[in-house]
Amino acid sequence: MKILVVNCGSSSVKYQFIDMKGEKVLCKGLAERVGIEGSRLVHKVNEDKHVIEKPMKDHEEALKLILETLLDREIGVIRDLSEISAVGHRVVHGAERFASSILIDEEVMKVLEENIHLAPLHNPPNIMGIKAVQKLLPQVPNVGVFDTAFHQSMPRKAFLYPLPYEFYEKYRIRRYGFHGTSHRYVSKRAAEILGRDYYDFKVITCHLGNGASIAAIRHGKSIDTSMGFTPLEGLVMGTRSGDIDPAIVIYMQQNLSIPVEEVYNILNKKSGVLGLSKLSSDMRDIEDAAESGNEMAQLALEIYIYRIAKYIGAYTAAMNGVDAIVFTAGVGENSPYVREKVCDYLGFLGVKIDRNLNNMKGVERIVSTPDSRVAILIVPTNEELVIARDTKQIVESGIKELKLF
């Protein structure tokens, strides 16, 4: 079975084509600047990269070009579209309706469109991608895998906000959490690496990219996570503020006369590491500047690391202990400095890291010492593989929903 995994952003389509026999990635790529001048497709087969510059006015044209490229005699990997057994879609927000990966039909599409208001930036392009595939490959089943689904196991004490209860009853304002597919993959993989039973295992997973979140996973279920009603809550991120006093928003509007749209833009695109450092949202730039003596970069790093450590401490308490802590995503996988400084806060847990192992790059590994009471791991995330696995299981089994917990 060969599965096409699709992740549609507002002006991009990211894809992987995976042969599930051996779970081999046959090709992958990115259609970028979709609907914008200068659109192009970057297509990779093994180590070979091919760039196709071609106008793509919308997601349908982008997906059509991707399918044409898969069929290309020179750089393609299939001879006929019938070789595509199914398409798995990343969908950012499944609301409370979807706590599972699901076979997409008319009813599912209706629910997705009804919940656009919960993810107005992310769900519309996800929906456009699904509709385009349904048109281009009408006989091929489509499966939706939701970023929020894994966190639907959270108890009410974790997902409810202390607002008047009617805000939840009427408007479903609550913590949803995101990056669920990543947290699910790396937590399971950590249990495998350590030879532990996933369903008798307490793990804290740190997905640290430009967007960042932490999850507390006990016995295979997410019991809490740092992102909330939107991906703005929680950790200090590349350009997002994370946790702040909500009254600051009111102050910015009333006392500083900043329009609500600009407040939203400031909190999402001008804050975080970028706002604190006045320099960059890229942690590599921040670390280089901090090492060169830039005090604002040093401060941004300190605040970023401190917030991560605070959440780890809180989630250790929430689970009454922790067996392992996992670092993943761009910063989590590639910044020895961030990992080391976070772990420096965790001596009270008996955390000890091997600095030589920690300083290695790009390899899945345990970086804690043998006598560390908590295992520290680096696990590169693989959300596309999770989507492909769920898609395969649903299509092969003939089921509509794949329960995650």
UniProtKB/Swiss-Prot annotation:
Catalytic activity: acetate + ATP = acetyl phosphate + ADP
Active site: D147 (proton donor/acceptor)
InterPro entries for this protein: Ac/propionate_kinase (IPR004372), Aliphatic_acid_kin_short-chain (IPR000890), Aliphatic_acid_kinase_CS (IPR023865), ATPase_NBD (IPR043129)
Cofactors, names only: Mg(2+); Mn(2+)
GO MF terms, alphabetically ordered: acetate kinase activity; ATP binding; magnesium ion binding
A Pfam family: Acetate_kinase
Cellular component aspect of the GO annotation: cytoplasm
Presence of keyword DNA-binding: no
Principal location: cytoplasm
Positions contributing to ATP binding: K14, H207, L208, G209, N210, G211, D282, M283, R284, G330, V331, G332, E333, N334
Positions with a binding annotation for Mg(2+): N7, E383
GO BP annotations listed: acetate metabolic process; acetyl-CoA biosynthetic process
Chain positions of site Transition state stabilizer: H179, R240
Complex and partners: Homodimer.
Name the UniProt record assigns to this protein: Acetate kinase
Protein source organism: Pseudothermotoga lettingae (strain ATCC BAA-301 / DSM 14385 / NBRC 107922 / TMO) (Thermotoga lettingae)
Organism placement in taxonomy: Bacteria, Thermotogati, Thermotogota, Thermotogae, Thermotogales
